[in-house]
Amino acid sequence: MMYQAAYKEEKAVAIRYPRGGQAVLPEDYKYEKHAFDIIGDDSKDICLVTYGRETECCCEAVKECDNAFVLKLNKIKPLSNEIADVLKNTKKIFFLEEGIKSGGVGECFAELLLENGVNAEYRHICINDEFVKQASVDSQLKKYCLDAQSVIDIVNEKI
């Protein structure tokens, strides 16, 4: 995606370099300029919604969770109303982000679901409105339940 943004896009783009490196996505994933992408089978009951580096953890988690798929947001503002059509039959939606809860993308996503009549159970996994102390990326992801194992445990209702 970095190559696409730097060399192929005709419009302005923002490139960010996340601390700890870029996410590793499934080999068969290809960015197609859509507002969002589905990774896995969207007929499953559980959806993990995310963006950025957290996509890697979610993709790892769905390998261990039989009834889940990933919805990767490529565009976070404005959110596409087409998302509601994809999720209308989903039973549980977990929104995972490395951002704060209050005013974050997950709050906007919950509003989109509500406004479009998506009646799935919704859980927002993120950083509560608090100061995040300096630490390694891996330790912070674990602390805030955003690492792959925590995501597996959340989906399997162990957390």
Regions found by a protein language model. Name each.
Residues 1-7:
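Internal gly/pro-rich beta-alpha loop/helix module
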Residues 7-159:
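Thiamine diphosphate
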